Amino acid sequence: MPIGVPKVPFRSPGEEDAVWVDVNRLHRERLLFLGQEVDSEISNQLVGLMVYLSIEDDTRDLYLFINSPGGWVIPGLTIYDTMQFVPPDVHTICMGLAASMGSFILVGGEITKRLAFPHARIMIHQPASSFYEAQAGEFILEAEELLKLRETLTRVYVQRTGNPLWIVSEDMERDVFMSATEAQAHGIVDLVAVENTGDFA
């Protein structure tokens, strides 16, 4: 049986008494979570939170914790683009798995502020297709769109990892799983967490 969203006390600036509100206090602390497949719903939620928190205070960093098997490309690109658009730096933290679009969002964090937990796994690959569902004439259109998306993803990985195009293209040909230290060597994350340094204060 689900517990639901907890009520937490929140006092608005200028108010004397706190009121109990249905709000996730973690969001108030600017901590965001991607703990599922990337789809339109979670993408819209994260984008809305990033924009809202940026309007509320554009000087405090955002922290996006990722444990995701990946998912849809366009909603993932939406999250990535919003991370680049909002004024606060977005720290990305991989805890568990960042695969497919999860790793793409991970690499989209502010450079020098991308972190992976020691036992995290990161996986990159090329975008998938649904050719088996399409009619013959739709194959060509879908293939062209897929190539454009692959070029976009590849370009971003090249820019944000510092790796040459040929290495990124080769890695995206198949599923490439990496440990946290391998992802750091690959430029997907900047740091591997080893202990609590108190940075989240």
UniProtKB/Swiss-Prot annotation:
Q: Which UniProt keywords apply?
A: Chloroplast, Hydrolase, Plastid, Protease, Serine protease
PANTHER family from the entry?
ATP-DEPENDENT CLP PROTEASE PROTEOLYTIC SUBUNIT, CHLOROPLASTIC ATP-DEPENDENT CLP PROTEASE PROTEOLYTIC SUBUNIT 1
Q: What residues sit in the active site?
A: 100, 125
Record-annotated membrane-spanning stretches: none
- Read off the InterPro entries from this record: ClpP, ClpP/crotonase-like_dom_sf, ClpP/TepA, ClpP_His_AS, ClpP_Ser_AS
Record's GO cellular component, any one?
endopeptidase Clp complex
Q: Which organism is it from?
A: Chloranthus spicatus (Chulantree)
The name on file for this protein is: ATP-dependent Clp protease proteolytic subunit
Q: Which Gene3D superfamilies match?
A: 2-enoyl-CoA Hydratase, Chain A, domain 1
- Secretion signal, residue range per the UniProt entry: none
* Role of this protein: Cleaves peptides in various proteins in a process that requires ATP hydrolysis. Has a chymotrypsin-like activity. Plays a major role in the degradation of misfolded proteins.
What's one GO BP annotation on this UniProt entry? Answer: protein quality control for misfolded or incompletely synthesized proteins
Q: Does the keyword Chloroplast apply?
A: yes
Q: Which major enzyme category is it?
A: hydrolase
Task: Give the highest taxon in the source lineage.
Answer: Eukaryota
